[in-house]
Swiss-Prot record:
Oligomer with a subunit composition of (alpha,beta,gamma)6. Keywords: Cytoplasm, Phosphoprotein. Belongs to the CitD family. The modification O-(phosphoribosyl dephospho-coenzyme A)serine is found at residue 14. It comes from Klebsiella pneumoniae. It holds the Pfam family ACP. Disulfide bonds: none annotated. This is Citrate lyase acyl carrier protein. Transmembrane segments: none annotated. GO terms for cellular component: cytoplasm. Covalent carrier of the coenzyme of citrate lyase. It is found in: Cytoplasm.
Length: 97
């Protein structure tokens, strides 16, 4: 899946996460995480983001995660929504989600 535009999903409210995804000039996933629980859960957040992007077939993107203590299911949903928006996909492949 190719990222065509910058897109975001989520809010900066408590227990939520804002995910921004856009096209990258360099190959690979460029990931920046800012989280109130980064010291405890930073590695887990990174793993969830990378797994979710891999499931969607995203190989090249700039990703910024601004986490306010979101649950894993919320993080996964926000990453999916932002990636689909950035790819400008209108036809969802539900089996990938």
């Amino acid at each position: 899946m190719e990222m065509k535009i910058d897109a975001l999903a989520g809010t900066l409210e408590s227990s939520d996460v804002m995910v921004r995804i856009g096209p990258a000039a360099q190959p690979g996933i460029q990931l920046e995480i800012d989280s109130i629980v980064k010291q405890q859960f930073g590695a887990a957040i990174e793993q969830v983001v990378r797994e979710t992007l891999a499931q969607l077939g995203v190989k090249q993107a700039n990703v910024v995660v601004d986490d306010k203590g979101a649950l894993e299911c919320v993080l996964r949903a926000r990453v999916q929504a932002a990636a689909l928006r950035a790819a400008q996909q209108t036809q969802l492949q539900w089996s990938q989600l």
